[in-house]
Regions:
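Extended basic (Lys/Arg/His-rich) segments that typically form rRNA-contacting surfaces
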Residues: 1-243
Length: 243
């Protein structure tokens, strides 16, 4: 499987070679830096860890800072963190060497299992891993809508607007029976927080690949607002019929 981290830039329309106008979403897919390659012998499974987009170093959490220092483009680097087992000058030397290690601040990190490309820590990959005509799945977070009622959140029809409705136009109505079963059934559609949830859109066709700018033009819409981060991976379910 091949995958990348990217950012949604916006939507537009392009014309295909046969003159069809197609709605596409522009995704900045890279460059992705290979941070770590996990193996069965060392980690228990095969995976490739990719990083995308820069960040101010002072905004890095201590955990991410330590991870980036330990995996800064070196496959077999074993961090010698200054622990209690090392005393005196040796411990101080370890501390100075650890603090002096340069890091590249990275905002987004994600693992891809069963990565089909032969890459090593320190390598950089981009949109050219895909080709026009490939089908991909795009994972992103839907736009947050805040607390919403059942009409907007679940597309309820609402109550009558007249004939003595008494203000029930957008209310949910009954949420269950009485003493039997005596509780609200699990999964009942009710008002609540809408959006800001992970969503996957499958089998989107790549219309164009602009490798120089690391841009993918994907047919249709993808989750999230402009500027949101997304994951683009090789489609798991190949479309049965394509036009």
């Amino acid at each position: 499987m091949v995958g990348l981290l990217g950012k949604k830039l916006g939507q537009t329309r392009v014309y295909t070679e046969d003159g069809r106008s197609v709605s596409v979403t522009i995704v900045q897919a890279g460059p992705n830096q290979v941070l770590q390659r996990k193996t069965v012998g060392k980690d228990g499974y095969e995976a490739v860890q990719l990083g995308f987009d820069g960040q101010k170093e002072q905004r890095l959490s201590l955990a991410k800072r330590g991870h980036l220092k330990a995996h800064n483009g070196e496959e077999n680097y074993t961090p010698r963190s200054p622990g209690r087992t090392v005393k005196g000058k040796a411990r101080l030397a370890n501390r100075k060497a650890w603090d002096a290690r340069a890091i590249t601040p990275i905002r987004r990190i994600k693992e891809f299992r069963d990565f089909s490309l032969d890459v090593n820590p320190g390598d950089s990959i981009g949109a050219d891993v895909f080709e026009a005509g490939d089908y991909v799945d795009v994972i992103g977070k839907s736009k947050g809508r805040g607390f919403q009622g059942v009409v907007k959140r679940w597309n309820f029809g609402g109550g009558s607007g007249s004939h003595g409705s008494g203000g029930w136009r957008r209310r949910p109505g009954s949420i269950g029976a009485g003493s039997t079963p005596g509780h609200v059934i699990k999964g009942k559609h009710m008002p609540g927080h809408m959006g800001q949830a992970s969503r996957t859109v499958q089998n989107l066709e790549i219309i164009q690949v602009q490798a120089d700018d690391n841009l993918l033009l994907v047919k249709g819409a993808i989750p999230g607002a402009n500027g949101d981060y997304v994951v683009i991976r090789e489609s798991k379910k190949k479309p049965k019929k394509t036009k």
